[in-house]
Amino acid sequence: TRMTPTVRHEKAALGVLLIGAFGFLWWLSSQWYVGPSDGYVAVYQGGSSVMMTSYVPMMAAPSFYAGLILFAVGALIACFVFFGTLVVAKRDKTYQGSVPLVTFGAITAAIIAVFTIASGAIILIPTFLLSIGWISAVDPLVYRTIWWAFGHSSQQINVAAHISIWYLVAAVAFGAKPMSERVSRTAFLLYILFLQLASAHHILA
């Protein structure tokens, strides 16, 4: 059957919209690489020697905070792409039953990453606005408390990802299996739920 001009135009518009959306997502994802570059330049220029914690009121250049925010945007988009891939895999029935243990561990890392990025945004965006003079102050105690919700959990993304990779290497290289997948999955879940309790030692130090 022949399509009417209206239908053709609607399909063409949808195609352009999808291409634009994918292009925008790719651009956002590229900030994962652009952001650190901005931060490195700011540090090498000598005006952003605030070390890892970057506590206020020790201020860095605006490009330092902008680099962190851009990196976070790219990482967040990557997490959403990962979650979208899981939805497609479930729809296409690429696996039976629950997701594989390695994937479950990667999901754990991605969930922690989303929490980490959200915590960073809550405190780094106001700090960036402070650095460019749009707001007058950021409470140092509030900054420190929220910053470690971001700083502590950012380390644990790597831990969850590393454990997942260990499971993968053990299975591929040696054919090994965990003694109980249920226990392993429960451990990942508990890791998500109680991760932030351990961040208290940063605040109390």
Placement of each model-derived feature along the sequence:
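Membrane-embedded and interfacial regions of multi-pass energy-transducing membrane proteins
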Residues: 1-205
